[in-house]
């Protein structure tokens, strides 16, 4: 009887010593977006945002889409097209008007100031990840 009680106590104690690995430990990809903002630039919208990669490995943006525009482009600070953008693991990449950002051209409908809409970044590994974007 004492032996069973000791074994039960030992098993109970050992069950509390469980290791739960994080995304970094397992080596996965984890991407999150935030701070989506848009401003008018002529007839187009210029979108800035932050991409947070908290996984061990990075991912690559291969495209952009949005229901408010017929054309969504990933461009560099000079306005030239960017076909692919590497997002390294364990890093934050800021999209600003002076660096890489998104341009929404040929708007499908009028977008009013204060309105929110989704811009979807298409990743090679993670698929589509939406950014809630506010027109300022």
What residues fall within each predicted segment?
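C-terminal motif of bacterial Sec signal peptides marking the signal peptidase cleavage site
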Residues: 13-16
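N-terminal export leaders
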Residues: 1-11
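Compact, glycine-rich, soluble single-domain proteins
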Residues: 18-136
